[in-house]
């Protein structure tokens, strides 16, 4: 249809551009537009080269219209407006003020600095966490005297954090070209990483089960079987990830299986189980704090001290049970402040959680500190004894003989 004839129809039957706003016809994107003159002090309805419909307007008005939804494949912020003047002689100004129409792409560029800072936080947090986690792992490995079921569960949780963080670093090293080529080894790394993510959350679930059983159900922990918790933590995630990998292979086999396509929910095969674990742990936390408050009220301590102890216990349990992930599980909003808070909070939480678990459940653990202190004193005593023996042996009583009597006296000290 000729552009001029189309504008005549628009001016006659859709002078307010209501139909065009509703249907967004393809006629809006005509490359040329001419003005059809009507007698009278008003400007006729017309369409500009961008595709914006300008309604019939009185002469002398400055008319505003919403910015186009998209142009040349770039989406724009439609909450802002474009302006055009209707002259006194009833003709439109040839220049339209599109300066307020900001591409949505600029919003992404606006967050570029925040994403870079968040990436630095991620690398720093994962490095600090791995260092703390490895130290905690070695302490649990060397201190055999504290190997009760509770500490064995802590040990396994710390192990999953170490493996998860190592796989995270491997994922960051994958080149973009390899990511696009969808190499087999790249998909294997993604699969292993997701397995350790799921095992990490399932060991948080094991922590919740143990605490809930011991505190709420008042069940003797001596009757709990270690192999049951090992099966839950390491074995149950396996079929979940295998199912996810098979579905990825047949239905979404691209980009190293990282991310997901719109409208496809394959990742929820394992993410759904993670969400379920977090919800159950939230119930565990609620019951544990409830029982704790009941016991504190029964004690003779003041109310302020009771609440302080309850808050302290809750804060300590949050990273152990993974409840902190639920604080910003989804983006709280699309405004700038919400986006920035979401970016930084998740970067800090995901990278430093291993560090906090190491601090709360190893470095500040009374049993671990006591056992480590005894082990240190024992090593110091043994070392000082060896030094004294070495000194005694280095001072002979004659050119050919060593006084073993002095060594015996030194060893008896």
UniProtKB/Swiss-Prot annotation:
Superkingdom per UniProt: Eukaryota
Single Gene Ontology BP annotation: adenylate cyclase-modulating G protein-coupled receptor signaling pathway
Membrane topology (Extracellular): 1-110, 174-187, 252-267, 330-336
CC annotations in GO: axon terminus; dendrite; plasma membrane
Record keyword Transmembrane present: yes
Pfam family, one: HRM
The keyword Cell inner membrane appears for this protein: no
Compartment(s): Cell membrane
Segment forming the signal sequence: 1-22
CDD domains registered for this protein in UniProt: 7tmB1_CRF-R2
Mod. after translation: A N-glycosylation site within the signal peptide impedes its proper cleavage and function.
Membrane-spanning intervals of the chain: 111-141, 149-173, 188-216, 224-251, 268-293, 305-329, 337-366
Family label: Belongs to the G-protein coupled receptor 2 family.
Entry protein name: Corticotropin-releasing factor receptor 2
Lineage: Eukaryota, Metazoa, Chordata, Craniata, Vertebrata
